[in-house]
Swiss-Prot record:
Gene Ontology cellular component list: nucleus
Name the record gives this protein: Transcription elongation factor A protein-like 8
Keywords: Coiled coil, Nucleus, Transcription, Transcription regulation
Function: May be involved in transcriptional regulation.
Compositional bias per record (Basic and acidic residues), positions renumbered to this chain: 1-10, 61-75
InterPro entries with a match to the protein in the record: TF_A-like/BEX (IPR021156)
Gene this protein is translated from: TCEAL8
Family label: Belongs to the TFS-II family. TFA subfamily.
Nucleus keyword on record: yes
Disordered: annotated segments: 1-75
Coiled-coil stretches: 73-100
Cellular compartments annotated: Nucleus
SS bonds (residue pairs): none
Chief location: nucleus
Length: 117
């Protein structure tokens, strides 16, 4: 039976039940896939950090590694080593380029070259 207009007045028709009115079975269980809200009430996935680690990418790394101060001499040695490695890479690259060029432009081809007059 429908209620009269006076009884329905002021009450929304599709109002969800309050939490205390619901039976215990309807309350969702917090388990497997439900993200836990953080202290501010915003889920960690909404923050953009699904793993729940430190918010700043380098924050945990800074705590784990000791602070290392380099001497100017040690920095110069590192730069010298990088320059040496770059020169070695340059030499090897040039070597392979020359080998490739020689193979493509050699006169002893496995097949005869026909020139048209």
């Amino acid at each position: 039976m429908q209620k009269s207009c006076e009884e329905n007045e002021g009450k929304p028709q599709n109002m969800p039940k309050a939490e205390e009115d619901r039976p215990l079975e309807d309350v969702p269980q917090e388990a497997e896939g439900n993200p836990q809200p953080s202290e501010e009430g915003v889920s960690q996935e909404a923050e953009g950090n699904p793993r729940g680690g430190p918010n700043q990418p380098g924050q945990g790394f800074k705590e784990d590694t000791p602070v290392r101060h380099l001497d100017p001499e040690e920095m110069i040695r590192g730069v010298d080593e990088l320059e040496r490695l770059r020169e070695e890479i340059r030499r090897v690259r040039n070597k392979f380029v020359m080998m490739h060029w020689k193979q493509r432009h050699s006169r002893s081809r496995p097949y005869p070259v026909c020139f048209r007059p």
